[in-house]
Amino acid sequence: MNNEFFMKKAIEDAKAHGHHFGAVIVKDNKIIAKAGKRPRGDARFHAETQAILKACKKLKTRTLKGCILYATCEPCPMCFYMAWITNISKIVYGATLQDSIKYGFPEIEVTAKFLNERSGNKIELKDSFMRDEC
């Protein structure tokens, strides 16, 4: 299985929940957690944060070293922090923050690349992957 397979799973999950944002966490080529819709009225639970919390619970750990986060959109600062603090090894995302803003979603214009460059524990980033599909 490859990046395309897992990104398609994130896209499918977003669409299944009637949402634009989806996230999948993979370890050892297996899906550990996925999320696509946040609870109504709770802005803390973006697809990425939900998937991270589910993965930590499933693996019974606070660290996700060796895991890859696939997200249909570039993680916002909150979601990037969650990935960073749990030691996710890699983030693969499709649409960019600028794409999200262009389509009317409220965003703080601080990119994952900017945050990553200033972190002490860098995450491997693969940006704009399957951007058009996302």
List the predicted regions and their residue ranges.
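Glycine-rich phosphate-binding loop at the start of an alpha helix
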Residues: 4, 45, 49, 77
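Helix-adjacent hinge/juxtasegments
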Residues: 53-86
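Zinc-dependent deaminase
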Residues: 1-17, 75, 81-134
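Short beta-strand scaffold segments in enzyme catalytic cores
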Residues: 21-29, 33
